[in-house]
C-alpha cells in the first residue's frame, strides 16, 4: 500500500490542515518533479477527506486492526435528513411539472419552508462536523476510536451531500 502521507510529504497523523494539503499538492504539481500526477491527485483526494484519511492512517499504522463492531450513528438524525430531502425533492418535482404561474406561485411558501428546514439541518451537520474535527485534532492512538470517528465523518458527509443537493433542487424551484 502506498503511503499517501509520504507522497505529499506530510506527517502521518489522522488530522491534517486542509489548506496545508492543498498547498503541498499544488507546489508538487507545479514543480513538475513528481513522476505520477495521478498518485498526487489520489493523495490529495484521500487526505482531504477526513473519513478516507483516517481509514488510510489506520491501514498504515494498524494493518492488523479489524473493528470489533460497527459504530452506532444517530439514526434519528439520519431519518430527519432523509425525510427533509425527500420532501424537498418532491416539492421541486411538483413545481417543475406545473406550467401555470399561479400554480407554481402557490408552492412558494412550501418551498421556502422546506428550504428553511434544510438550512437548519445543514447548520446542524456543520456543527457536528466541527465537533468531530475537534475530537480528531485531539486524537489518541486508539484504532477503535479512530474507526468510529471515520464512520461518523462518512455518515455526516453523506448527509451533508444529501442536504446540499436538496437545497439546490429547491433553489432551482424558486426560479
Which residue stretches match the model-derived regions?
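C-terminal accessory/regulatory regions appended to core domains
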Residues: 1-175
